[in-house]
């Protein structure tokens, strides 16, 4: 039986070896590149695979159609996932006739999700285990094939329990894999009523609350002991980490967080005292408790505290889905420039946000909104403001993939809106200037202009009507269920990181990127229907400032409002945009590295976009709502925007590529 394996960590190594020992043919292994910021104390699946002579890959997005096609060419009979960190798309799961199976580090249906090893210790469980289950679209929700229980001893910490689970996993796989190889794969459904879900743990989750019971604090120490980041507290501004501890039942009447004694080092909790056996001050070395007390300058009666607060208010948590996109990455930068915002983000890639990945107030998970529904629901509940920015928003895709546009832009986003309703969270939703369609007004008014689209046989309008329908649903939820919302409608925002030249090469980019690609490659600039269509181009900096003010929502003035964000003064036809771009290109210092200008070429829209396309003559916003609600006025001239956008793309072109 031929297998394709997705694996990482020690469990991944155990799984690969067990599959080989059971006599399977492994066609390929998919793993992850190690993160330099992570403590990689565990075994390397890639080194194991290379040593065994098995092809091994570590794609950024294994769910990309290119990788799906490559896996299909391998023709696997069965798929295994052993601690692979990303969910697999349904397209991949359906490639193996015998099914796809995941090894999870808990006794399902309990502790679905991330970091079950740590969570069972945090919660003081006495038993856990490993489960092999069928993979379905929802994480850890498929039918159970086999499981093995593991007792948790009182002196177990994260690393010792990790070793126990690896041993149990190997035993489980050794017993079940030969049976599965013969085609006998019995499974039983999980009981949904018993399901629990836990999210990813972060280093900052190790902060100790001394007002908790001593058993809770001790369990936290066990759960994140080395090589995990550790449980920590503060003496003044000095951070220290506790690596091992024991419970003392008597707090001697001391207040929580008070140092009872320094030799041994004991700290009062809500109902007892924690004895600190070993610990570490700052980035120093690990020492025993009494030496730690001496290093920190602790005396009996001292009070430990939480980290020094930058302000009395909790930071506002903003959830951005599609955080790696054009708007998402620029908005993240604006929010992180303010001390009182924390950003949680998801996207299928991280190239545009790589500059934020180590920022302490930026929390990113690579994932797909159509797959990671439980993560999304958890973070909608956790955050204060939600921005669902994921959408297919390039015209050629409207005619090429109308059903996919509807599924993503409407159906997936509707689910997120319903989470916002359920947990009573404020949503800032990206409508679009496209909802106005072929409106005949000189400028489009959010509250008065008619929304006019073409006939059903023009799939070009699928994006417009998907967004419009969601606008109406959100409005109805506001009226009937009290949903707090603001709809914003961007008008042709431009700037650095708009999209990519590779996207332009397959026709799936914004207009200016396509024009820049023509200049870079020395191909004619294509003017669709002569390029007479007029748009109002808005600098990303102006747009993001307006969006930031919507999030701030001073005096709640944005609640229940629809706000156009565009620059009426920057109106130009596509032909005028192309001419301005060409002028800037000819003056650019890198101009000599690129081919000669190949001229303009007039192209009929039907031949470029397909028969389902229909264009709009003009699109100009009224920005009265933005002025009134935000005190906002765009200020950046179109030429400045064009020059900055062009400069970004030209400098992104590889030197060798320029020369060719």
UniProtKB/Swiss-Prot annotation:
Give the positions of the site Raises pKa of active site His.
140
Pathway listed: Nucleotide-sugar biosynthesis; UDP-4-deoxy-4-formamido-beta-L-arabinose biosynthesis; UDP-4-deoxy-4-formamido-beta-L-arabinose from UDP-alpha-D-glucuronate: step 1/3; Nucleotide-sugar biosynthesis; UDP-4-deoxy-4-formamido-beta-L-arabinose biosynthesis; UDP-4-deoxy-4-formamido-beta-L-arabinose from UDP-alpha-D-glucuronate: step 3/3; Bacterial outer membrane biogenesis; lipopolysaccharide biosynthesis
The answer to whether the entry has keyword Lipid biosynthesis is yes
Q: Per the record, where is site Transition state stabilizer?
A: 102
Question: What is this enzyme's EC?
Answer: 2.1.2.13, 1.1.1.305
Q: Where is this region: Formyltransferase ArnAFT?
A: 1-304
The UniProt record lists the keyword rRNA-binding: no
A Pfam family of this chain: Formyl_trans_C
Binding, NAD(+) = 347, 368-369
- A molecular function (GO) term: UDP-4-amino-4-deoxy-L-arabinose formyltransferase activity
Family statement drawn from the similarity comment of this UniProt entry:
In the N-terminal section; belongs to the Fmt family. UDP-L-Ara4N formyltransferase subfamily. In the C-terminal section; belongs to the NAD(P)-dependent epimerase/dehydratase family. UDP-glucuronic acid decarboxylase subfamily.
Task: Please describe the quaternary structure of this protein.
Answer: Homohexamer, formed by a dimer of trimers.
Q: Please explain the role this protein plays, according to its UniProt record.
A: Bifunctional enzyme that catalyzes the oxidative decarboxylation of UDP-glucuronic acid (UDP-GlcUA) to UDP-4-keto-arabinose (UDP-Ara4O) and the addition of a formyl group to UDP-4-amino-4-deoxy-L-arabinose (UDP-L-Ara4N) to form UDP-L-4-formamido-arabinose (UDP-L-Ara4FN). The modified arabinose is attached to lipid A and is required for resistance to polymyxin and cationic antimicrobial peptides.
Q: State the protein's name.
A: Bifunctional polymyxin resistance protein ArnA
Which source organism does the UniProt entry give? Salmonella heidelberg (strain SL476)
Its gene name is arnA
């Amino acid at each position: 039986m031929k297998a394709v394996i997705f694996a990482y960590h020690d469990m991944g190594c155990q799984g690969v070896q067990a599959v080989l020992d059971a006599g399977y043919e492994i066609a390929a292994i998919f793993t992850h590149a190690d993160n330099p910021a992570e403590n990689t104390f565990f075994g390397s699946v890639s080194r194991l695979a290379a040593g065994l002579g098995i092809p091994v890959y570590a794609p950024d997005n294994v769910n990309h159609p290119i990788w799906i096609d490559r896996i299909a060419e391998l023709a696997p009979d069965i798929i295994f996932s052993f601690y692979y960190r990303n969910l697999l798309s349904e397209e991949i799961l359906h490639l193996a006739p015998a099914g796809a199976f995941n090894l999870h580090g808990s006794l399902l249906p309990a502790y679905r999700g991330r970091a079950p090893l740590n969570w069972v210790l945090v919660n003081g469980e006495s038993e856990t285990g490993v489960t092999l289950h069928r993979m379905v679209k929802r994480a850890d929700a498929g039918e159970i094939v086999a499981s093995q229980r593991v007792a948790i001893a009182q002196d177990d910490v994260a690393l010792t329990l990790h070793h126990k689970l690896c041993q149990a996993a190997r035993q489980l796989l050794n017993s079940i894999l030969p049976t599965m190889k013969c085609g006998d794969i019995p499974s039983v459904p999980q009981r949904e009523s018993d399901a629990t879900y836990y999210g990813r743990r972060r280093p900052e989750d190790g902060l100790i609350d001394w007002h908790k019971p001593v058993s809770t604090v001790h369990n936290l120490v066990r759960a994140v002991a080395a090589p995990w980041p550790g449980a920590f507290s503060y003496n003044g501004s000095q951070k220290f980490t506790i690596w091992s501890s024991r419970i003392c039942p008597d707090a001697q009447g001391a207040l929580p967080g008070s140092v009872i004694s320094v030799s041994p080092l004991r700290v009062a909790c809500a109902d007892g005292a924690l004895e600190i056996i070993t610990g570490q001050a700052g980035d120093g070395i690990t020492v025993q408790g009494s030496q730690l007390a001496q290093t920190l300058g602790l005396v009996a009666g001292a009070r430990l505290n939480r980290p020094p607060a930058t302000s009395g208010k909790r930071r506002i948590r903003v959830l951005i889905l599609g955080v790696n996109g054009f708007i998402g990455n620029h908005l993240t930068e604006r929010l992180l420039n303010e001390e009182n915002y924390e950003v949680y983000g998801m996207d299928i890639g991280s190239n545009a946000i790589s500059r934020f990945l180590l920022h302490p107030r930026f929390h990113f998970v690579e994932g797909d909104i159509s797959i990671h529904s439980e993560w999304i629901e958890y973070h909608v509940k956790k955050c204060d403001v939600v921005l669902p920015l994921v959408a297919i928003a390039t015209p050629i895709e409207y005619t090429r993939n109308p059903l996919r546009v509807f599924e993503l832009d409407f159906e997936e986003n509707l689910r997120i809106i319903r989470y916002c309703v359920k947990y009573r969270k404020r949503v800032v939703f990206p409508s679009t200037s496209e909802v106005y369609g072929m409106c005949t007004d000189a400028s489009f008014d959010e509250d008065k202009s008619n929304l006019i689209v073409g006939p059903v046989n023009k799939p070009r309008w699928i994006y417009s009507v998907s967004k419009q329908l969601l606008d109406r649903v959100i409005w109805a939820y506001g009226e009937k269920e009290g949903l707090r919302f603001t709809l914003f409608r961007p008008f042709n925002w431009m700037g650095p990181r708009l999209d990519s030249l590779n996207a332009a090469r397959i026709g799936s980019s914004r207009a200016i990127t396509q024009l820049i690609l023509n200049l870079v490659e020395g191909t004619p600039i294509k003017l669709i229907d002569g390029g007479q269509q007029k748009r109002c181009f808005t600098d990303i900096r102006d747009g993001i400032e307006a969006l930031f003010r919507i999030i701030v929502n001073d005096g709640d003035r944005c609640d229940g409002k629809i706000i156009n964000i565009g620059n009426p003064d920057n109106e130009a036809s596509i032909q005028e945009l192309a001419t301005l771009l060409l002028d800037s290109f000819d003056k650019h210092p890198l101009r000599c590295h690129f081919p000669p200008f190949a001229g303009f070429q007039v192209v009929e829209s039907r031949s470029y976009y397909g028969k389902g396309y229909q264009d709009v003559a003009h699109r100009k916003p009224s920005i009265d709502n933005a002025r009134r609600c935000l005190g906002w006025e765009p200020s950046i001239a179109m030429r400045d925007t064009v020059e900055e956008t062009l400069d970004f793309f030209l400098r992104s072109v590889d030197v060798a590529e320029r020369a060719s």
